[in-house]
């Protein structure tokens, strides 16, 4: 039996969501799943070409990437006819009380806004890298971190992502595929 065709689509501002998607792709490939990775900017396939689509989007200033919102709005019907998974990447998820789909305010707002019901949903904490941000982004993110009691200075990037949680999400998707 041929492995189901899995597409992984991401929207990333600073590259960390892409890194998470690449990790998911490796996990699924090790499980003999056939995957193709796309940036939302160059997704040129049809949703119906896939058995499963995994969509990942990061948060910037409290909002998910506009292109992901547009993609879901334009493809809602097609997405409802295949298996889907969605994950959000945001720094708020670094906090224990906001690191699950049930407690993360950005993910809850996103799902209400899109009215999309993926088969599997997850939230991952992102990366904080002041050195890579523009001056304006650095000031804004430092302000947000101050309000949320996070670090406002760091010479090195801080990766808050729980990579075991990413792995478990990938394995959960694989298990759902085997049941279908």
Each language-model region and where it sits:
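FMN-binding flavodoxin-like domain, especially the glycine-rich phosphate-binding loop
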Residues: 2-3, 27, 31, 36-38, ...
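Short beta-to-alpha linker loops that shape the active-site pocket of alpha/beta-hydrolase fold enzymes
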Residues: 12, 41, 90
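Short, charge-patterned binding micro-sites
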Residues: 44, 56-57
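Short amphipathic alpha-helix with an adjacent loop that forms part of the alpha/beta core around
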Residues: 43-49
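N-terminal beta1-alpha1 ligand-phosphate binding loop
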Residues: 2-29
């Amino acid at each position: 039996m041929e492995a189901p065709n899995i597409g992984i689509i991401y929207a990333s501002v600073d590259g960390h969501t892409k890194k998470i998607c690449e990790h998911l792709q490796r996990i699924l490939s090790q499980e003999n799943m056939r995957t193709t990775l796309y940036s939302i900017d160059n997704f040129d396939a049809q949703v119906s070409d896939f058995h499963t689509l995994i969509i990942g989007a990061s948060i910037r200033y409290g909002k998910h990437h506009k292109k992901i919102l547009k993609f879901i709005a334009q493809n809602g019907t097609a997405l409802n006819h295949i298996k889907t998974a969605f994950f959000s990447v945001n720094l708020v998820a670094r906090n224990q009380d906001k690191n699950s789909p049930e407690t993360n305010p950005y993910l809850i707002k996103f799902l209400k806004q899109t009215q999309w019901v993926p088969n599997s949903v997850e939230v991952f904490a992102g990366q904080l890298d002041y050195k890579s941000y523009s001056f304006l982004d650095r000031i804004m993110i430092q302000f947000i971190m101050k309000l949320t009691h996070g670090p406002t200075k760091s010479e090195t990037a801080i990766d808050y992502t729980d990579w075991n949680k990413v792995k478990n999400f990938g394995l959960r998707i694989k298990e759902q595929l085997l049941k279908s």
